């Protein structure tokens, strides 16, 4: 059994906002609150990055139209004692998805980590 760091992307809607920074703050705060309410403090939440199609430089994954923002969040969780990457991904989606109901989640990376007790 191996430990994995699983990174997921979540699409978070924020209504009634006019500023990208406000939308990002609200999205990260709301996601963190919902995770903490379900005792999932170990899930890291931050704004995702999208590469610029012209220059390739990353920028914050957030878009506002009609006072509604779509914010891409990056969620990271360490999964212990998984049978493989697919198993770790399923565990991560189940853990996080249970706390963030009705929020689209997609696994974007799954990396094997070192055991701490070796």
From Swiss-Prot:
Which InterPro entries would you find in this protein's record? UPF0212 (IPR007564)
Q: Which domain of life is it from?
A: Archaea
Give TM segment ranges.
none
Q: Which HAMAP family match?
A: UPF0212
Alphabetized NCBIfam families for the sequence: PRK03922.1 (NF003035)
Please give the family membership noted in the entry. Belongs to the UPF0212 family.
Q: What is this protein called?
A: UPF0212 protein HQ_2663A
What is the organism field in this record?
Haloquadratum walsbyi (strain DSM 16790 / HBSQ001)
């Amino acid at each position: 059994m191996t430990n994995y760091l699983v990174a997921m992307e979540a699409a978070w809607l924020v209504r009634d906002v006019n500023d990208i920074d406000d939308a990002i703050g609200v999205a990260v705060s709301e996601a963190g609150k919902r995770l903490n309410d379900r005792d999932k403090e170990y899930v890291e939440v931050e704004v995702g990055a999208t590469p610029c199609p012209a220059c390739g430089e990353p920028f914050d994954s957030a878009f506002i139209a009609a006072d509604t923002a779509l914010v891409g969040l990056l969620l990271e969780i360490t999964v212990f004692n998984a049978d493989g990457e697919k198993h770790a991904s399923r565990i991560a989606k189940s853990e996080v998805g249970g706390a963030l109901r009705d929020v689209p989640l997609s696994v974007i990376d799954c990396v094997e980590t070192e055991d701490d007790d070796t």
